[in-house]
C-alpha cells in the first residue's frame, strides 16, 4: 500500500501545474487533490467521497502554513487526520488550519469531507509564512483548536459580531513557541496589533460564483489591504471581538490582519462571510427577504408619502394624518417590541392601527382648535428626526464618543429639535420641506421591501439603537454601490420636484388654511338664519336616512297586479 502511494506521488510530480491565481482543474487522482502555495483551487466535495489535499515541495524558509477552505452555505470539514479530533479539525463554511512545519519537512496533507447530502462547491488555498511572521490564533484559549486562525461569526437582526483568538509571535522550525501570557513587554505577543477589515459583495447578488470569486481578494495580506476597508485597529489589550450592523441580504466578508510593528511583518486570518440570512430555513430565507406584510405596509405608506411630497401643503389635514402616523407609529413600535414577544406581522398590524389613531388625532386637534404650534411642532420634529438620522448615517456615527447612549440620544434629540426652531420665522417653508423630504423618503423604504438598498438604514439604524442595547457598540458601515446611487438620485429628484412644485403652487395664497371648526360653525349658523339659502330647507340627517331606507324598501316590495279582484255582485 505504501509503495502504491509513492507511485501516485511520482505520477503527480511528473504532471505540469497550472499557472495563475486560481486552479480550476479536477482531481489529480481519485480522492487526492494537489495544491500549490498561494494558488486557489475550485473542487466539489461529496458526502460519501472524502478528499485528501496534499502540498509538496515546501520551501525551507517556510515555518508554518495556513490551509483554508470556503463554501457558500454548506458546511465542510477540514482535519489533519482521517479521525476527527476537536483540537485538530474544524467544520463550517469558512475554515482553516495552521500547520507548524517540522525541520526538513517539505510535504503536508489535510483531509477534506462534507456531511451535506448535496455536493458542495469549494475553493481552497494554502498560504505560507516565515518565522518572522506572527501566527494567527497562536495564543488561543477560547476555541477548540490548539492554534486557531479562524474568525467566528454570529449574527441576529440587529448586529453581526466577529470573534478571533489572539496571535503569537513567529518562531523557527523545531523551536519552542514563545509564551503567551508570561511577559507583557515589547518582546512578547502583546506588541501585536490587529486590523479588522470589511468587504461588501455586490448588492442583490447571492450567487455562489460571486462569493467564491470575491473571497480570493480577502485571503492574502496585500489583496485585503487593497480591496477591503479597514474598520478599526485593536491592540493586544483590547477584546478580540468587533460588532457591525447586520445588513440582511447583503453579502459581507470580514478578515483580520495581525501586524508585528517591531519586525514590520503581518499575517492574515481565515476570512469569514455572511449574508445575515439563511439559505436553508424557510424563516428568514435569503431568497425571500421582504415579508408580504412589509411589502403591503410600505407600499401603501409610499403611495401616501408620494401624494404628500407634491400636494401635502395644499391638503393640510391629509399631511397632518401622515405626520401623526409616523410620529405615533414609531414610538408605539418601539414600546410594544420591547415589552412584548409578539410576532413581526402582529407588531406591524398594531403599529398601523396605532399610527392611524395618532394621525386622526393630530388632524382632529387642528380641526377643532386650529392651533398651528402643536401641529407644526410635530411636523418639524419628523423632519428633524430624518435630518438627525442622516447625520449619524455618515462616518460621524462610528465615532467612539457616540457609543455612550446618553451622549448619542442627547445629541440626536438636539439636532431633531433644532430643525423646527431654525424655521420658526418661515413656517410654510418648514412644512413644504417636511412634505418633500419625508414624503419622498417613504419611497426609499418601499423600495427596500422589494430590493436591498443601504439608504433604508438611515432610519433603521436609529430604530435598532432604540430596540437593542448592545447595538451601541456596532459599526454602522454600509455599502454604497450602483443601486444606491440610483435610488439616491430618485430620492433627491422627488424631493426637489415636490418642494419646487409646492412653493410655486402656493405663491400668493394664504400661508395656512383657516380654522376648520370656525368655518363649519359659521356655515351652520348661516344656513339656520338665511331662509333664502337652499341648504336651509334640507331636511335633517335622520329624516334623510329614513327617506333613503324607504326608497330601498320600495325596490324589494312585490308589485301588486292591476285589475279588479273582488267578485261582481249579481
Report residues per predicted region:
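Juxtamembrane membrane-interface segments at transmembrane-helix boundaries in membrane proteins
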Residues: 234-236, 241-244, 275-294, 301-305, ...
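Cytoplasmic-side transmembrane-helix entry/capping segments in multi-pass membrane proteins
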Residues: 319-325, 346-351, 372-382, 403-409, ...
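Membrane-helix interface "capping/anchor" motifs
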Residues: 311-320, 340, 364-377, 422-433
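Soluble extramembrane domains flanking the early transmembrane region of eukaryotic membrane proteins
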Residues: 2-286
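Core alpha-helical transmembrane segments of integral membrane proteins
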Residues: 289-365
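Hydrophobic alpha-helical transmembrane segments and adjacent interfacial helices
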Residues: 327-339, 357-367, 382-397, 416-421, ...
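Hydrophobic core segments of alpha-helical transmembrane domains in multi-pass membrane transport
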Residues: 13, 302-309, 358-361, 416-420, ...
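C-terminal transmembrane helix-loop-helix hairpin of multi-pass membrane proteins
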Residues: 2-18, 26-27, 39, 426-570
